């Protein structure tokens, strides 16, 4: 297990990170200087650093280069925006790293196939973290790394669009939502958005839709 502190849990002067005793199978990067750790059994080189400040505007990774040792060279990189270590991912990949495992954003995002990706949070952090969450799994085959995203979260935040017609009623809207929830399952958490054109005389009660399972938000964008 390779662990580094990011901007939310950065290593303050009095942080427990500084002298915490980790388990033998955990490698923790303790400062803001890029360090390389080799796994002798697997011939894997892991490069990483931890945040000692909440914001770091310097591109600390841009000068990073893999060593010359035979094996797999993996860069752990947290950030990617102007306030949290801006970086040139394509440039780092071209510099010779076999894979760049990225952190900072909560949603999974593949930047370079089998080369660089944000795994995202294992579970959604808030209702704006829509879609699947999980982890990136890698397999080394014949000297080539193959990766794939593995869904893991127990629940996900999903968005349901309910389209109104001129003959729609509150009851028909509720029936539409009930059917949609039945097909998606009741394990997830939903944001409902009402769209479309409605009859002038139609009185909608959007808040009533919150009683249909795990609905946390209802937005009426109809006209």
Q: What spans do the regions from the language model cover?
A:
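His/Asp/Glu-rich metal-coordinating catalytic cores
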Residues: 1-139
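Accessory, non-catalytic peripheral segments of nucleic-acid enzymes
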Residues: 145-223
């Amino acid at each position: 297990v390779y662990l580094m502190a990011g901007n939310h849990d950065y290593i303050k002067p009095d942080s427990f990170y500084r002298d915490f005793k980790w388990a033998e199978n955990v490698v923790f990067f303790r400062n803001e200087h890029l360090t390389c750790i080799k796994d002798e059994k697997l011939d894997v080189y892991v490069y990483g650093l931890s945040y000692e400040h909440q914001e770091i505007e310097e591109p600390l990774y841009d000068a990073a280069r893999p060593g010359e040792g035979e094996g797999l060279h993996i860069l752990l990189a947290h950030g990617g925006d102007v306030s949290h270590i801006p970086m040139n991912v394509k440039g780092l990949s071209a510099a010779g790293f076999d894979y760049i495992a990225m952190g900072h954003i909560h949603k999974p995002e593949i930047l370079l196939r089998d080369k660089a990706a944000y795994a995202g949070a294992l579970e959604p952090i808030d209702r704006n973290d829509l879609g699947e969450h999980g982890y990136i799994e890698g397999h080394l085959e014949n000297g080539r790394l193959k990766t794939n995203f593995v869904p893991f979260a127990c629940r996900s935040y999903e968005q349901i669009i309910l389209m109104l017609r001129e003959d729609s009623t509150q009851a028909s809207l509720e029936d539409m939502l009930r059917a949609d929830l039945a097909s998606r399952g009741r394990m997830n958490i939903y944001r409902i958005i009402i769209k479309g054109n409605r009859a002038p005389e139609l009185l909608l009660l959007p808040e009533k839709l919150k009683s249909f399972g795990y609905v946390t938000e209802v937005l009426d964008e109809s006209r």
